[in-house]
A protein has these predicted regions:
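Membrane engagement elements in two modes
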Residues: 10-11
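Charged, low-complexity intrinsically disordered regions
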Residues: 3-5, 16-202
Length: 202
């Protein structure tokens, strides 16, 4: 174990245990490589975990954050960093809303079903700074992802973040928990989320 630690640094479980202790969160390690960190924020629970996608010859690991909440008006958004093919995608008709902050607009593709609320959400400087601090990001409000039946009750959506790889940077993980808290609060201020428990356990 000492040699492995020298080669690869602290394990994910060690890092996540430290994170939970510093945030007053719950860390539930899993012997088989899963595990999660959960923190209660008001009526919501923000969950950090990982998942794996196997494509035959290769296996891809992802870090994700989720926070189910009662969506008051069906508002959705999606944000990710621009890349080399963004220009082509926009030419082919991909939506890219401008939020009114030049540096942010130049760095990110922002999509949503209510442009006024998208601009109001990202008018929050704290939200923009936390998003800009992420080297990679796929952050959105998305609906129920059950293939054959609903996982969440009617009216419940989730705030969702994912990125390739396993994040073991404590400060970055703290920033992501903070981002979720700020966005949930802002969604409430915009009338797009209810301050009630979604009655969902992850």
């Amino acid at each position: 174990m000492g040699i492995l630690r020298q080669l690869f640094g602290p394990s994910r479980d060690e890092i996540w245990s430290q994170l939970a202790a510093e945030l007053g969160a719950r860390h539930e390690p899993n012997f088989w490589g899963g595990g999660k960190v959960q923190i209660d924020y008001g009526e919501w629970t923000i969950t950090l975990d990982t998942y794996t996608v196997s494509t035959g010859k290769t296996t891809h690991h992802y870090t994700r954050f989720r926070a189910p909440y009662v969506n008051a008006d069906g508002f959705r958004f999606d944000i990710h960093r621009k890349h080399i093919f963004t220009g082509l995608s926009k030419w082919l008709g991909m939506q890219d809303l401008e939020v009114g902050h030049k540096e942010f607009d130049e760095a990110f593709v922002v999509q949503g079903n209510d442009e006024t609320k998208v601009r109001a959400l990202f008018a929050n400087e704290g939200i923009r700074k936390l998003i800009a601090a992420q080297p990679a990001i796929a952050f959105s409000v998305r609906g129920d992802q059950g293939w054959f039946s609903r996982i969440y009750p009617d009216g419940v959506d989730e705030l969702y973040f994912q990125v390739g790889g396993i994040i073991k940077d404590v400060e970055r993980l703290k920033e992501l928990f903070a981002l979720f808290g700020l966005v949930l609060d802002q969604l409430c201020e915009l009338g797009s989320a209810y301050v009630t428990s979604p009655q969902v356990k992850l």
